[in-house]
UniProtKB/Swiss-Prot annotation:
Coiled-coil boundaries: none
Keyword field contains Cell cycle: no
Keywords: Late protein
Protein name in the entry: Protein MGF 505-2R
Upregulation: Expressed in the late phase of the viral replicative cycle.
Function: Plays a role in virus cell tropism, and may be required for efficient virus replication in macrophages.
InterPro entries documented for this protein: MGF_505 (IPR004858)
Superkingdom as given in the UniProt entry: Viruses
Length: 489
């Protein structure tokens, strides 16, 4: 519980002019050898009505003098007890520290506030169960190089601490400590330094690591390649450039940049590359299914003109990566026909169907190309895009008249007849008369005989007129065809 006097002191911001030294002393608002104390806001005080100090700096001074009364007052004014402890350590006022020991708890929390190495070590010594190793770790953490230098001899006898402190210095980015450890003690492996520098995007530490390596005369090609792969995979341009100062292959960088879609990295190097090299990167981008922006960047450096069309199409089909074709189509570079020709010739019906869907190519276009290449499997598989069998037959029937080659027409008619034979008998009745006339017109005798057998099985009473008309129509078609053949000969 606060006394009434404490409540007054805590909330009194303006001292009346009539308050003399005696009254101020009785109120506890007087600091011996300094003068009156007055609170200003939450974090400053006024001494003798003319000197402004931060509350924490005043606490440090009071702690150094061992003046507990002033310390208690400043703590009422929201001061930080840690500064009183720092001051007490500087003035060797251990009695004051012991009064607040229970409130402080862990003295490690005070260490970040200390600038002086001697005070730092004194503060750490207050932690009874901590030894030299703990002190050195905290000295590394808070960049207290003088403490490390003081214990250099002891450090030299504890080899295991070298690596530990070096790693901690990397984690906390203490460059002076890193330099000192490298100069005075042997750290076998610098990999941890590079890994942390990359993960923290710390170019200063990364560059320092290469200085250490260079001083050791160790810049192995494998190490440079590893660093280029890591930094390029993360798109760290400045790290890549730093590594390349010491060697390494730019192809490693470009491969990673394409693979992970780092356009800033790519753009920096593309301007320096010959066209052939960029075309190779485009093929890699297709293989890795790179993003639209990455493909556009590579194509823009080629002015959207690709000379190695055959190889590009092979990659597009092999890796089922059609985005580059879509981009070129928008730029009015039409590679669909060339790609279809390769695709239908070399790849499975399933893969052809997948690419057809991706590029929104019409089924008729694919089927016509498949007919040219005599790929019956692709014709059949592609025709399944029309789920209704009767629609499939209608679509294929319409295509027969657009095909120029006799072998192509025969193949398509065979496919159509196969579809017809798989129809239910009731559905066959709907198309058999139309197909029979088509077969006659296209001189498909085998299919015509087969369909006539089906016609004989029909109910004579119902279908006799239609069958009679079919015979007449077929005779007319044959007559016309014979006349055309005679005229041509």
């Amino acid at each position: 519980m606060f006394s009434l006097q404490d409540l007054c002191r805590k909330h009194l911001f303006i001292l009346p002019d009539v308050f003399g030294e005696h009254v101020l002393q009785r109120l506890g608002l007087y600091w011996r050898c300094h003068g009156s104390l007055q609170r200003i806001g939450d974090d400053h005080i006024l001494i003798r009505r003319d000197l402004i100090l931060s509350t924490n700096e005043a606490l440090r001074m009071a702690g150094e003098e061992g003046n507990n009364e002033v310390v208690k007052l400043l703590l009422l004014w929201k001061g930080n007890l840690h500064y009183a402890v720092i001051g007490a350590l500087q003035g060797d006022q251990y009695d004051l520290i012991h009064k607040y020991e229970n409130q402080i708890g862990d003295f490690h929390f005070i260490l970040p506030l200390i600038q002086d190495a001697n005070t730092f070590e004194k503060c750490h010594a207050l932690e009874r169960f901590c030894g030299v190793s703990c002190l050195l770790k905290h000295a590394t953490k808070y960049n207290m190089l003088p403490i490390l230098q003081k214990y250099q001899e002891e450090l030299s006898m504890r080899a295991y601490l070298h690596e530990t402190l070096f790693e901690l210095a990397c984690l906390w980015q203490r460059y002076d400590v890193l330099k000192w450890i490298e100069q005075t003690m042997h750290v076998y492996d610098l990999k941890i330094m590079f890994n942390i520098a990359i993960s923290k995007r710390d170019l200063t530490m990364y560059s320092l690591g290469y200085i250490f390596l260079f001083d050791r005369g160790n810049t192995e090609a494998t190490l440079l390649t590893q660093h280029l792969e890591k930094t390029a995979a993360k798109g760290l341009l400045h790290f890549v450039l730093e590594t390349l100062k010491y060697g390494g292959n730019i192809d490693t960088v470009l491969t990673q940049a394409v693979k992970y879609n780092h356009r800033k990295l790519l753009d920096y190097f593309l301007r320096q590359l010959p066209r052939k090299h960029i075309e190779k990167l485009l093929l890699l981008a297709v293989q890795e299914k790179a993003s639209k922006k990455t493909l556009n960047l590579l194509l823009s450096h080629l002015n959207y003109s690709v000379k190695r069309i055959k190889k590009l199409l092979r990659y597009v089909i092999e890796y089922e990566s059609t985005l580059v074709i879509k981009i070129l189509l928008k730029k009015r570079v039409n590679l669909i026909d060339a790609m279809l020709e390769k695709m239908v010739r070399y790849f499975s019906a399933t893969k052809v169907r997948t690419i057809m869907d991706e590029l929104s190519i019409s089924p008729e276009r694919v089927i016509k190309m498949a007919i040219q290449k005599m790929r019956t499997d692709i014709v059949i598989h592609t025709s399944y895009v029309w789920e209704d069998d009767l629609e499939r037959l209608t679509r294929l029937k319409n295509m027969v008249y657009t095909i120029k080659y006799e072998h192509g027409k025969k193949m398509l008619i065979k496919v159509m007849h196969g579809i017809y034979k798989n129809l239910l008998y009731g559905e066959r009745e709907k198309v058999m008369f139309h197909l029979a006339k088509l077969y006659v017109a296209q001189n498909a005798a085998t299919q015509f005989r087969d369909i006539c057998k089906d016609c004989y099985k029909l109910d004579v009473a119902r279908f006799k007129p239609r069958f009679k008309q079919l015979i007449l129509d077929c005779l007319e078609i044959v007559t016309k065809n014979l006349a055309i053949v005679s005229w041509k000969s």
